[in-house]
Regions:
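Gram-negative bacterial Sec-dependent N-terminal signal peptides
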Residues: 1-41
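Extracellular beta-rich repeat passengers
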Residues: 43-78, 90-100, 105-106, 110-260, ...
Length: 374
């Protein structure tokens, strides 16, 4: 496997002066506009075992995820306003299917999930004083798995039509044993309720496990429409910002900037909506995946096999999207069996194309685009 840099180098040139300076100042502007500022916490609490009973994390502590931590089925994790989770390399949080998470941040007291290296730059423990750094991959991510319909054809026993028995293993997670159910998502409940996220900032995270096997900033697998996500920020993630696999979950008020691959990635039949977004793509001299270069702003895919259902029929509203000028990267990339609508969105500074059709499986994505089906 090719080695992956943990740094996020950025090119300096007049062409990218606006984006470069926007990146430098976006910690302040983005967090202020979204209300993502707040007070720091006190003593550190190491978290080294899975969460098997309902648990509350308070803003009087900081929490250090030591390894891959699961919220197990039947358990609920509640995170109070103003709580800071500051982890070492390798720390990540995954909410298994059948568990719930409630991130109860507010405009004045957001929940911050970041690295200990980030917190070390805070003066007096105040996150408003943090220094933006050209870095990523300093901890893992937040993954939430649910019970909604997905279209996934590589799992033995899955079928081509929507089925409650279809499931998949979540990208980037490690099984404790073969067939570990805690890494699985998908089912037959499009009203799945895996909890809620309100005012959450995810910073300096992500992990490239292997080719096409990464931890995104926020990974959502098979979540239903009863799951609520409102006001979330992803900054400096080494892979995608947000990736959604199937389900019907909706999102409002999202900010994604300076990530190493796609900002907003969709797969396996997502049928939800996203509204009020800001995307600023990462830019680097090194165009390899996971190095800090942004790929597509939006990448939309359906089933891995285009005969499989449900297809991706999502909608994006009121997004401002700033790309980066690397050839081969698109403001929107369309792959097989994805039919996404964009309403009242502004796209600027794209790479090769504003709309790019990737006919990877040879089953007509380009044709669907040109004949108006999409």
């Amino acid at each position: 496997m090719e080695s992956v840099s943990t740094q996020v180098p950025r090119k300096t040139s007049p062409k990218n002066f606006l984006v470069k300076n926007l990146i430098k100042g976006i910690t302040a502007t983005s967090l202020v506009s979204m209300g993502l500022v707040g007070a720091a916490s006190a003593g550190e609490v190491p978290v080294s075992i899975n969460i098997a009973t309902s648990t509350t994390w308070t803003n009087t502590n900081t929490y250090n995820l030591q390894g891959q931590i699961f919220v197990l089925p039947g358990a609920t994790l509640t995170i109070e306003p103003g709580t800071v989770i500051a982890s070492d390399v390798g720390g990540s949080l995954a909410v298994s299917k059948g568990a719930q998470i409630f991130v109860n941040g507010t405009q004045n007291q957001p929940v911050i999930m970041t690295s200990k290296a980030d917190v070390a730059t805070w003066i007096g423990g105040d996150p408003k004083t943090g220094t933006w750094r050209e870095s990523a991959n300093e901890w893992g991510n937040l993954t939430i798995m649910g019970d909604a319909f997905i279209s996934e054809d590589s799992t033995p026993g899955n079928v081509a039509t929507p089925s409650a028995s279809n499931f998949a293993a979540m990208e980037g997670l490690t099984e404790a044993f073969p067939g570990d159910p805690n890494v699985l998502y998908g089912g037959g409940n499009d009203d799945d309720d895996s909890g809620s996220i309100n005012y959450l900032s995810l910073r300096y995270g992500g992990k490239v496990v292997s080719l096409a096997n990464e931890l995104n900033g926020l990974s959502l697998g098979g979540l239903g429409r009863a799951t609520d996500i409102d006001h979330v920020e992803i900054m400096n993630n080494v892979d995608d910002g947000i990736e959604i696999w199937g389900g019907t979950v909706n999102l409002k008020h999202f900010s994604i900037w300076n990530v190493g691959d796609d900002s907003f990635d969709v797969d396996q039949g997502w049928r939800g909506k996203a509204q009020f977004g800001l995307i600023v793509q990462g830019y680097s001299l090194n165009a390899s995946q996971g190095s800090g270069v942004g790929d597509n702003c939006f990448e939309t895919d359906g089933a891995e096999d285009s005969d499989w259902q449900p297809v991706t029929t999502a909608a994006i509203y009121n997004a401002t999207v700033i790309g980066q000028p690397i050839d081969g990267d698109g403001l929107t990339a369309w792959r097989d069996n994805a039919r996404v609508q964009y309403h009242n969105c502004v796209f600027v500074d794209g790479g090769e194309k504003a709309v790019r059709f990737d006919d990877l499986d040879g089953d007509g994505a380009q044709g669907y685009g040109h004949n108006g089906t999409l």
